[in-house]
UniProtKB/Swiss-Prot annotation:
Single GO biological process annotation from the record: ribosomal small subunit biogenesis
Primary residence: cytoplasm
Cofactor note: Binds 1 zinc ion per subunit.
Family listed: Belongs to the TRAFAC class YlqF/YawG GTPase family. RsgA subfamily.
Keywords from the named record: Cytoplasm, GTP-binding, Hydrolase, Metal-binding, Nucleotide-binding, Ribosome biogenesis, RNA-binding, rRNA-binding, Zinc
Lineage: Bacteria, Bacillati, Bacillota, Bacilli, Lactobacillales
Record GO terms (molecular function): GTP binding; GTPase activity; metal ion binding; rRNA binding
E.C. number: 3.6.1.-
Protein's UniProt keywords contain Nucleotide-binding: yes
InterPro entries xref list: G_CP_dom (IPR030378), NA-bd_OB-fold (IPR012340), P-loop_NTPase (IPR027417), Ribosome_biogen_GTPase_RsgA (IPR004881), RsgA_GTPase_dom (IPR010914), RsgA_N (IPR031944)
Keyword Ribonucleoprotein assigned: no
Subcellular location: Cytoplasm
Name used for this protein in its record: Small ribosomal subunit biogenesis GTPase RsgA
CDD domains assigned to the protein according to its UniProt record, in alphabetical order: S1_YloQ_GTPase (cd04466), YjeQ_EngC (cd01854)
Length: 296
C-alpha cells in the first residue's frame, strides 16, 4: 500500500484521471466523499492510495485555492479570456463583467481578441484603442494568435492551472485546438437565432501546456455578479483600487463623495468612461439583486 499526490486532469464516467510524478493514474473516489457531499473537481490536488494489486482510490482532496465555472475547475491561477471581435460583437461591457468577476475570484486574467481577421482595419484600430487602456492598467492583451502561441508556454508557470473563459462562440475551442494540437475539441458555428455559439464543449480536461496545465470549459455569455458585496465592488476594478488610496474618505464608493480620486481621474480622461459607466450599472444590478434581462 502506498500513497501518491497528484492533480485531477480529467473526469470520465465516475473515474478520475490523476497526474502523478510517475504518470496518469485512473482512479475512483472513496464513498466518504459522497457522505460529506464533496465532489472532486478537475484541477484538485489530491492524494490517492494504491494497493499491492495496483488498485487505486482517491482518498483526500487537498485544500483548494478556488473552484470556478460549470463544470467546475479547481485551483485556477489564471484565466485566458477570449473576447470576440465579431460574431458575437466586441463588447466592453461584457469584458468588464468578466474582469470584475475574476478579480473577485482573485484570478489573474490575460485578454485575447479572437476573430480580429474578420473585421475591417478601421474597426480593429478602434478595438485596439480600447484594449490599450486595459493593457495600461495591468492586463496583458494579445491580438495576434501567433504572438500568443509563442509566449503562452513561458507564461504558464510550474503546475499553474489556466482556464479558457469567454462568451459562447468567441472561439475558445478553436483557440485550444491551435494551442494543443491533439485536444480534439469540437468547434461549432454561431447559432444565428441567438447570435451565440452552440455549447460544443461537453467536458472539462486539463492539458499539459508550458510548465503547467490549460483547461477548456464550456462557453457562457453571462456572469452573475449579485453575490458580490456592494461596498466591495470598487475593489475589483483594479485602477479604482489603486486610485482609492488618494481618496479623501476611506471606503469611498466613487459616486458623490468629495475628494474622490477616481472621479478626478475620470474627469481628466485617465479612467475610461465606459468602464466607470459599467461600474455604476453593476452597482445597480447588485443593489437590486438580479441580473438585467438583456444579459441573461
Amino acid at each position: 500500500m502506498k500513497l501518491a499526490q497528484g492533480t485531477v486532469v480529467g473526469l470520465i464516467a465516475g473515474y478520475y484521471d490523476v497526474e502523478t510524478a510517475t504518470g496518469i493514474v485512473r482512479t475512483r473516489a472513496r464513498g466518504v466523499f459522497r457522505q460529506k457531499k464533496q465532489k472532486p473537481a478537475v484541477g484538485d490536488r489530491v492524494e490517492i492510495q494504491i494497493d499491492d494489486k495496483g488498485m487505486s482510490y482517491l482518498v483526500e482532496i487537498l485544500p483548494r485555492i478556488n473552484r470556478i465555472g460549470r463544470p467546475a475547475v479547481a485551483n485556477v491561477s489564471h484565466v485566458l479570456l477570449v473576447i470576440s471581435a465579431v460574431e458575437p460583437d466586441f463588447s466592453l461591457e461584457l469584458l468588464d463583467r468578466f474582469l470584475t468577476f475574476f478579480s473577485w475570484q482573485k484570478v489573474n486574467v490575460t485578454i485575447y481578441l479572437s476573430k480580429a481577421d474578420l473585421i475591417s482595419e478601421q474597426r480593429l484600430n478602434e478595438i485596439k484603442e480600447s484594449l490599450d487602456y486595459y493593457q495600461k492598467i495591468g492586463y496583458p492583451v494579445f491580438i495576434d494568435y501567433h504572438h500568443l502561441e509563442e509566449k503562452i508556454g513561458d507564461m504558464i508557470k510550474d503546475n499553474q492551472i489556466w482556464t479558457l473563459a469567454g462568451q459562447s462562440g468567441a472561439g475558445k475551442s478553436t483557440l485550444l485546438n491551435h494551442l494543443k494540437k491533439d485536444a480534439n475539441q469540437t468547434t461549432g458555428a454561431i447559432s444565428t437565432s441567438l447570435n451565440r455559439g452552440k455549447h460544443t464543449t461537453r467536458k472539462v480536461e486539463l492539458f499539459k501546456l508550458g510548465h503547467g496545465f490549460l483547461a477548456d470549459t464550456p462557453g457562457f455569455s453571462s456572469i452573475d455578479l449579485t453575490p458580490i458585496k456592494l461596498n466591495e465592488l470598487c475593489n475589483y476594478f483594479i485602477e479604482f483600487k489603486r486610485a482609492s488610496k488618494k481618496c479623501k474618505f476611506r471606503g469611498c464608493q466613487h459616486i458623490k463623495e468629495p475628494g474622490c480620486e477616481v472621479k478626478k481621474l475620470l474627469e481628466e480622461g485617465k479612467i475610461l468612461h465606459s468602464r466607470y459607466d459599467d461600474y455604476l450599472a453593476m452597482r445597480t444590478e447588485i443593489n437590486e439583486g438580479r441580473m438585467p434581462e438583456y444579459l441573461k
